[in-house]
Amino acid sequence: MGCSVSKKKKKNAMRPPGYEDPELLASVTPFTVEEVEALYELFKKLSSSIIDDGLIHKEEFQLALFRNRNRRNLFADRIFDVFDVKRNGVIEFGEFVRSLGVFHPSAPVHEKVKFAFKLYDLRQTGFIEREELKEMVVALLHESELVLSEDMIEVMVDKAFVQADRKNDGKIDIDEWKDFVSLNPSLIKNMTLPYLKDINRTFPSFVSSCEEEEMELQNVSS
């Protein structure tokens, strides 16, 4: 039953902008109600790390990923932008859970493929152009600290783009991307986070605190 009882007992508690009911989020993501509530505890920590307003700002997102809000990375920026569905410069709780759901081991592969396509579509045109592919490749290499010469990067990008752009029109559409990923599944390997399959084990302190809170409520009502 998790913390659902304790949450319902606090109907008057202030909720941040974009807060969505855990039961609703559980119905549209691979997470259970209890796991959504555990993610809310994580969300509260992230959203108050710099600005305590119940929203995750890009600097807070950078801090969570790199422990350094001043370190810029195109890949991290793109993840933030795709999480920010409303495109208002912040990540709300509902957006946080729904987007994380794509990284769940049980999430459908087509959702992971679609999410990855959005990451590479830097200019949000509905297509991935060669320069966008190169920018993302460079960002990923930088993040992995793998050093390649400019010539090697060009060869890598050219080979990938030719393979993906089957229509030879200078851009990769979503259908071409799906085919490309099916031939190169490693492209979405990082789209799965195993620990999301068992949030309760990932955040044991939260689970234990919830159980204690429920026991207290039962004692009060008995």
Curated annotation (Swiss-Prot):
InterPro entries the UniProt entry points to: CNBL1-10 (IPR045198), EF-hand-dom_pair (IPR011992), EF_hand_dom (IPR002048)
Every EF-hand domain range: 35-70, 71-106, 108-143, 152-187
Membrane topology category: Lipid-anchor
GO molecular function, one term: calcium-dependent protein serine/threonine phosphatase activity
Entries under PANTHER family matching the protein: CALCINEURIN B, CALMODULIN
Family per record: Belongs to the calcineurin regulatory subunit family.
Name this polypeptide is given: Calcineurin B-like protein 4
Originating organism: Arabidopsis thaliana (Mouse-ear cress)
Species classification: Eukaryota, Viridiplantae, Streptophyta, Embryophyta, Tracheophyta
